[in-house]
Amino acid sequence: VSKVRTATEVDVFVGAQLKVLRKSTGLSQNELANQVGVTFQQIQKYERGTNRIGASRLWSLCQVFNVKPGRFFEGVEKHMAKADTKSSAD
């Protein structure tokens, strides 16, 4: 039995942070992919939040951008509060 993995709001948020970091350093998706050993399609999926970033991959990304892992989660509490408010209003 295979489990379908769905992206969470946190995955989407972390992916958006990845995109911000990548663009701020001027790297293309392809260049970043080469540096961390994945395809550019995988970077696209990370940035959209459709694929989760595992701990070891997150560590590799931190090395590329010279940031601590917490950088990817800065502001997530506020983002989640907005998402919760939005979903309870539906």
Give residue ranges: language-model regions.
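A short, Lys/Arg-rich alpha-helix, primarily the initiator
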Residues: 2-24
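Short basic helix-loop element that most often maps to the first helix and adjoining turn
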Residues: 16-31, 35, 60
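Conserved hydrophobic/aromatic packing and binding residues within compact polymer-binding modules
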Residues: 18, 32-33, 43-46, 72
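Recognition helix of helix-turn-helix/homeodomain-like DNA-binding domains
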Residues: 36-53
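Short, basic-rich loop-to-helix N-cap that marks the start of a DNA-contacting helix
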Residues: 50-63
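Short C-terminal boundary/hinge segments that cap the last helix of small helical domains
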Residues: 66-83
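Helix-turn-helix/homeodomain-like alpha-helical modules used for DNA recognition
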Residues: 85-90
